Amino acid sequence: MPPPKKFRVQSKNYFLTYPQCSLSKEEALSQLQNLNTPVNKKFIKICRELHENGEPHLHVLVQFEGKYQCTNNRFFDLVSPTRSAHFHPNIQGAKSSSDVKSYIDKDGDTIEWGDFQIDGRSARGGQQSANDSYAKALNAGSVQSALAVLREEQPKDFVLQNHNIRSNLERIFAKAPEPWVPPFQVSSFTNVPDEMQEWADNYFGTGDAAPPDRPVSIIVEGDSRTGKTMWARALGPHNYLSGHLDFNGRVFSNDVQYNVIDDIAPHYLKLKHWKELLGAQKDWQSNCKYGKPVQIKGGIPAIVLCNPGEGASYKEFLDKAENTGLKNWTIKNAIFITLTAPLYQESTQASQETGNQKAQG
């Protein structure tokens, strides 16, 4: 008669099942952490489940830094701290730690310690299909959570396609920019030039009627602190583009009424999207730096705000001989306003600011 086969398991990943175990997850984790092994433990995850008769059992994944050889089938036994009871597990080497972790995660009553060590076995034909992984990523709720899912379940894609995956997820999970709340109401701007007010009335005063198909834009030039930015931003929902053009979904929305272009040098706008923005063109693309092309819905006017002087003034820029063609186009698509005084009376906005502070207090 051959001698009984000696117990021996050698693996980096151990899957333990305690069929009848009344210990809490926390107590079990503490005892497993304190086991002395020649190989460092890297990760432990425990799930507590109930049998149909209400008796609890535990599933455990233990990951080691390297292969650990276990020759004592009582090594992973747990002990009750309150009574004389031992809990003996079924011990298996786990071929795919990802599959075991997914199995343990299914009921949600879990606790873990350490950093999960990703393996590629699941992605090479285990239980976790690519479609399942990406569906799980879409349901993760955020870019970082989705990336964590794919890092664990689709490591090859995560490494080789990281840039594309991250870019796509950022677009998928992009939130609309928070609406800007103006500190002053439009009614506080009492010195708005007639032509400037007429432009605003023609575009914003249509009520329920459809806006013009190709609305005219407006270029407002004036000294600093004349109120032009506050006026422009108080008219309604808008995109605010300042200093440079940024069509990132975190700051730019296709569901606004107009664009505010503030302190963007005319030579820069000429190189980018002068005609698209000032001409209220529809359905055009912008190639963002280090990103994929962004589709712009368009069809809305721009309020361009600038200061006088070389390099800032749009009027001076268009008066240059090399910009004659662009000037002729712009005259047909925008009106020009030069401010000679602030758009507000200081007493009007001061009283409104006081009222706002009282309402907030």
Swiss-Prot record:
<keyword id="KW-0945">Host-virus interaction</keyword>
<feature type="binding site">
    <location>
        <begin position="222"/>
        <end position="229"/>
    </location>
    <ligand>
        <name>ATP</name>
    </ligand>
</feature>
<keyword id="KW-0067">ATP-binding</keyword>
<keyword id="KW-0238">DNA-binding</keyword>
<comment type="similarity">
    <text>Belongs to the geminiviridae Rep protein family.</text>
</comment>
<feature type="region of interest" description="Oligomerization">
    <location>
        <begin position="156"/>
        <end position="176"/>
    </location>
</feature>
<comment type="subunit">
    <text>Homooligomer. Interacts with the replication enhancer. protein (REn). Interacts with host retinoblastoma-related protein 1 (RBR1), and may thereby induce the transcription of host replicative enzymes even if the cell is not dividing anymore. Interacts with host PCNA. Interacts with host SCE1 protein.</text>
</comment>
<comment type="function">
    <text>Essential for the replication of viral ssDNA. The closed circular ssDNA genome is first converted to a superhelical dsDNA. Rep binds a specific region at the genome origin of replication. It introduces an endonucleolytic nick within the conserved sequence 5'-TAATATTAC-3' in the intergenic region of the genome present in all geminiviruses, thereby initiating the rolling circle replication (RCR). Following cleavage, binds covalently to the 5'-phosphate of DNA as a tyrosyl ester. The cleavage gives rise to a free 3'-OH that serves as a primer for the cellular DNA polymerase.</text>
</comment>
<keyword id="KW-0540">Nuclease</keyword>
<dbReference type="GO" id="GO:0005524">
    <property type="term" value="F:ATP binding"/>
</dbReference>
<dbReference type="InterPro" id="IPR022692">
    <property type="entry name" value="Gemini_AL1_REP_central"/>
</dbReference>
<keyword id="KW-0547">Nucleotide-binding</keyword>
<keyword id="KW-0190">Covalent protein-DNA linkage</keyword>
<dbReference type="InterPro" id="IPR001301">
    <property type="entry name" value="Gemini_AL1_CLV"/>
</dbReference>
<feature type="short sequence motif" description="RCR-3">
    <location>
        <begin position="103"/>
        <end position="106"/>
    </location>
</feature>
<dbReference type="InterPro" id="IPR049912">
    <property type="entry name" value="CRESS_DNA_REP"/>
</dbReference>
<keyword id="KW-1048">Host nucleus</keyword>
<dbReference type="GO" id="GO:0042025">
    <property type="term" value="C:host cell nucleus"/>
</dbReference>
<keyword id="KW-0479">Metal-binding</keyword>
<feature type="short sequence motif" description="RCR-1">
    <location>
        <begin position="15"/>
        <end position="18"/>
    </location>
</feature>
<feature type="region of interest" description="Binding to RBR1">
    <location>
        <begin position="143"/>
        <end position="153"/>
    </location>
</feature>
<keyword id="KW-0347">Helicase</keyword>
<feature type="binding site">
    <location>
        <position position="57"/>
    </location>
    <ligand>
        <name>a divalent metal cation</name>
    </ligand>
</feature>
<dbReference type="GO" id="GO:0004386">
    <property type="term" value="F:helicase activity"/>
</dbReference>
<dbReference type="Pfam" id="PF00799">
    <property type="entry name" value="Gemini_AL1"/>
</dbReference>
<feature type="binding site">
    <location>
        <position position="49"/>
    </location>
    <ligand>
        <name>a divalent metal cation</name>
    </ligand>
</feature>
<dbReference type="GO" id="GO:0046872">
    <property type="term" value="F:metal ion binding"/>
</dbReference>
<dbReference type="GO" id="GO:0003677">
    <property type="term" value="F:DNA binding"/>
</dbReference>
<keyword id="KW-0808">Transferase</keyword>
<protein>
    <recommendedName>
        <fullName>Replication-associated protein</fullName>
        <ecNumber>2.7.7.-</ecNumber>
        <ecNumber>3.1.21.-</ecNumber>
    </recommendedName>
</protein>
<dbReference type="GO" id="GO:0016888">
    <property type="term" value="F:endodeoxyribonuclease activity, producing 5'-phosphomonoesters"/>
</dbReference>
<keyword id="KW-0235">DNA replication</keyword>
<keyword id="KW-0511">Multifunctional enzyme</keyword>
<feature type="domain" description="CRESS-DNA virus Rep endonuclease">
    <location>
        <begin position="8"/>
        <end position="116"/>
    </location>
</feature>
<dbReference type="GO" id="GO:0005198">
    <property type="term" value="F:structural molecule activity"/>
</dbReference>
<dbReference type="Pfam" id="PF08283">
    <property type="entry name" value="Gemini_AL1_M"/>
</dbReference>
<feature type="binding site">
    <location>
        <position position="59"/>
    </location>
    <ligand>
        <name>a divalent metal cation</name>
    </ligand>
</feature>
<feature type="binding site">
    <location>
        <position position="107"/>
    </location>
    <ligand>
        <name>a divalent metal cation</name>
    </ligand>
</feature>
<keyword id="KW-0378">Hydrolase</keyword>
<dbReference type="GO" id="GO:0006260">
    <property type="term" value="P:DNA replication"/>
</dbReference>
<feature type="active site" description="For DNA cleavage activity">
    <location>
        <position position="103"/>
    </location>
</feature>
<keyword id="KW-0548">Nucleotidyltransferase</keyword>
